[in-house]
């Protein structure tokens, strides 16, 4: 990596012009900006793990939204908990109530209600290397978000 490709660039060369396109390599939650009508959920979330790529900086493609705190990454457990919540059936139902289209823009995501910081951290404890399946996600959410 970067992979040789004649069609489209798949890496960013660090320079004064590209510096603003990059963020520190931390934990982030990524969501696709567009979903197809056939997809089970409108929002599909994943955790960016900075330990998988040895680089102090990272750039995300324009077709992704990324959750951050003041331009910096999130604590690992919070990122995992947020991704789990975004992948839940509950979040999908609420998102579809407020957004009838397949575009997932940052403004719509900001308007949504989220669990507390403590609840997100507890949710994150249930995510290891892989996101649990849908049924497990929903059970975890139901159990953990009953607690204040």
Model regions: which residues?
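Polybasic, glycine- and aromatic-enriched phosphate-binding surface used to engage nucleic acids
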Residues: 1-131
